């Protein structure tokens, strides 16, 4: 991915200097990541949580909403781009803490 595309589509919403550093240190995805086969989706039998990034330019937010609804996930919507973990750490941490405190 070009630096321009990374900054515009992948890291939109991230402070520009931080986004430039993220671009500089990224590495190619390991091909082995795509070699494995998933045999069972955990969301079919486990409670799930999902953060929809409303400004995501990498994954369409409508697709994110569809996936969250399909898995019956507890969902929050963030005014964030694809890297909501970086641009909205408190909101993402709150979602993780809610999931961690959930009793089945």
Listing of model-derived features with the role each one plays in the protein:
Residues 54-79, 99:
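Conserved loop-alpha-helix segment in the C-terminal half of the alpha/beta-hydrolase fold
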Residues 1-40:
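Helix-rich cap/lid subdomain of alpha/beta-hydrolase
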Residues 73-104:
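Catalytic active-site module of serine/aspartate enzymes centered on a nucleophile-bearing elbow/loop
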Residues 44, 49-52:
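Short beta-strand/loop motif that positions the catalytic acidic residue
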Residues 39-42, 65-67:
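Short secondary-structure boundary/capping segments
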């Amino acid at each position: 991915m070009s630096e321009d595309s990374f900054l515009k589509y992948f890291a939109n919403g991230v402070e520009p200097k931080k986004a430039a550093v993220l671009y500089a240190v990224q590495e190619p995805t390991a091909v082995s990541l795509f070699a494995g086969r998933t045999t069972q989706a955990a969301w079919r039998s486990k409670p799930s949580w999902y953060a929809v990034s409303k400004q995501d330019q990498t994954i369409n937010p409508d697709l994110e909403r569809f996936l969250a609804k399909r898995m019956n996930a507890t969902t929050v919507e963030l005014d964030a781009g694809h890297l909501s973990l970086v641009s909205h750490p408190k909101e993402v941490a709150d979602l993780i803490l809610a999931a961690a405190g959930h009793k089945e």
